[in-house]
Amino acid sequence: MFSKESFIEGRTILIDKPLGWTSFDVVKKIRGAIKEKYAIKKIKVGHAGTLDPLATGLLVICIGKHTKKIQSYIDEKKTYSGVFLIGKTTPSFDLETAFNKVFSIENINMEKLALISQNFIGKQTQTPPIFSAKKINGKRAYELARKGEEVQVKKSEIEIYDFKLNIDSFPKVSFSITCSKGTYIRSIVSDFGKALNNGATLIELRRMASGKQNILDAKTVEEFISSI
């Protein structure tokens, strides 16, 4: 059960972020609901790892004194499932922007896809998408990219622990991946396309787990608000 005191002392809740919402949209909605329900003027609410608007799934929300735990949740491994499309690319590496290149997929075979996926296992350097929330001189990279400005994003060290493909609906490829914090799945997909000497675009993404936290234990925003 929830109470005013329990939220102030600290709670961590698991939310299934809906498609089209930003992670901050979820935080704002939950904060507003708690403040209204319990007549609290101010309460800290934050999330432990951004999900893009076009992604769904697990969002760890920390409330009250539990906001001190946010970094520890951010540092945990993440597991995602999703779908990418072989043969087309976009500037954002997903469907936020329109397709800008089309490639022939005649010479792509299933064995090659499986082999390349295994080459991604391990530690590596990744370049985040220019359409990302990474800050460059105080501004978000996506803000600069949308203005058509040149964007140079610093590379980061990541690790892929597991990467599995399901190729039943080629050129759409379903996948599951477990990775370190800070990994951009869009960049993994883009790099996968390049490794094929082709192109690839992320078309669906869902976060399934963050450390021990699992989507199976998450509530929708509406379910949580109705329970407080």
List the model feature ranges, each with a label.
Residues 1-228:
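Catalytic/RNA-binding core of pseudouridine synthases
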